[in-house]
Amino acid sequence: ASEKQRKPPFWRYDLAQNNLLMSSHHMSESNLPFYYEKLKSFKPKEIFGYPSSIYRLARYIVESDKDRYIPNVVITTAETLLPYQRKVIEEAFLCSVVDQYGCTEMAFFASQCRYGVMHFHPEHSIIEIVDANSNPLPNGEPGEVVATSLINKVMPLIRYRVGDRLSLVDRALKCHSYFPVIG
């Protein structure tokens, strides 16, 4: 990396949306203090990003016994949020962590409710779980995700094979949501 990339800032502002965009690429043990100080001074209401990057900063905060900045929520996306990561992130930021699941093509979107259950959002897309021959599978059986986007007006995706495998389940939920549940 060039000398310029080894020193702050490792972020840029999106003034139109009042966002601070921090580089995951430049996160290193020696740079974490800069990230911490910038986050603390910016005081975001929400922290949104890769679980691995947020976890790395959270671990630094916990292990260094830093003062806590408490956002309203931490939202993770684009990677699997592992239980040990969630625990450290919650400990560092003293707030709930909401995980999201989707794809760049905007073919589908899912998120966790406050009870930790991952729901697809039917206003966003139509989801099917199919076998290798594109036949629909009943709830509880794992198969390939096929999605029809209801929001991408630029490039409509109809029965788009996402490449992910999962199952949907029928479940009585505390949250009383009727949205499909990922099993």
What residue spans do the PLM features occupy?
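Hydrophobic alpha-helical hairpins/lids featuring a short glycine-rich hinge
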Residues: 1-2
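Active-site glycine/GP-rich loop and adjacent strand/helix microenvironment
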Residues: 14-183
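Short, flexible, mixed-charge acidic loops at enzyme active sites
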Residues: 6-13
